[in-house]
From Swiss-Prot:
Protein name listed in UniProt: S-adenosylmethionine:tRNA ribosyltransferase-isomerase
Subcellular localization(s) per the UniProt record: Cytoplasm
The keyword Cytoplasm belongs to this UniProt entry's keyword annotation: yes
Assembly behavior: Monomer.
Function: Transfers and isomerizes the ribose moiety from AdoMet to the 7-aminomethyl group of 7-deazaguanine (preQ1-tRNA) to give epoxyqueuosine (oQ-tRNA).
PANTHER family: S-ADENOSYLMETHIONINE:TRNA RIBOSYLTRANSFERASE-ISOMERASE
GO biological process, one term: tRNA wobble guanine modification
Main location: cytoplasm
A single MF term (Gene Ontology): S-adenosylmethionine:tRNA ribosyltransferase-isomerase activity
EC number, UniProt record: 2.4.99.17
Protein's organism: Staphylococcus aureus (strain NCTC 8325 / PS 47)
Catalytic activity: 7-aminomethyl-7-carbaguanosine(34) in tRNA + S-adenosyl-L-methionine = epoxyqueuosine(34) in tRNA + adenine + L-methionine + 2 H(+)
Amino acid sequence: MNIEEFDYDLPESLIAQTPLKDRDHSRLLVMDRETGEMKHLHFKDIIEYFRPGDTLVLNDTRVMPARLFGLKEETGAKVEMLMLTQIEGNDWEVLLKPAKRIKVGNKLNFGNGKIIAECIKEMDQGGRIMRLHYEGILQERLDELGEMPLPPYIKERLDDPDRYQTVYAKESGSAAAPTAGLHFTDELLIEIKNKGVNIAFVTLHVGLGTFRPVSVDDVNDHEMHSEYYQMTQETADLLNDTKSKGHRIISVGTTSTRTLETIRRDHDKFVETSGWTNIFIYPGFDFKAIDGQITNFHLPKSTLVMLVSAFSSRENVLNAYKTAVNLEYRFFSFGDAMLII
């Protein structure tokens, strides 16, 4: 299967640069998973597609203000560091810009010494493992010194950083938002609960792979990045009960999907667990966890387009994307949404 099979034409003007004033006023393309039949609504209308007994699964990760600007201690050269994934203790996987002159042993200074980052391992494509030295609590230092790490295709400054967080964001650790969740408001979630729909949470911290394109021609040769996930006993019990009663599990975003499918693959049921997943979902994948998913419109030739294609079909998804382009839907992180069910 060639990467070019997941390409599509997208005018740059359709890449949403700012969020809408009201989260749930974005447009919603509802697509039948089997037939590809489409309907066009607004996100607040999504409640029409939920049934009592369904469980909606949200990723409660919180985006860190993880973009830092500092100086190389030895030379005073300016450097930008994007913190991606906590490896262990104070060791973090990061992206540096520029990176080529940052070698093992070099130190970076942020905020006049409030954070010192020492390079302990070089990786490819600008990646490094850095050991952080700081006083107090890291989250407080990041809140003081860091900026929100918006995706590279967003060129405009975000006036309100909370608009790149879901309203239910809780567990800090992501380098990017689980953007399908950005459409939900507190009020909409209450309406959904009042309809008899369960709300469950998992955590998956979005990391390095979000910022890197697929670099191989043959999809089978792609190595997926690893991301940390966790599921509580409460969520596991609720999901197992949903399945046993014949109700549906609907995931919000590809991150929730990857978490749920990882756990069902590894344990044959939902269990309290945590770990790292590099699950790669592309056409031919056998879904065992979800019955529907909510997702944004993703970048051409990305693993996320492959994931949604696996859940329906490549033909259905690319036809839906072509329709969305023709109808001038908004694309990517601050864009509109799909419900595939």
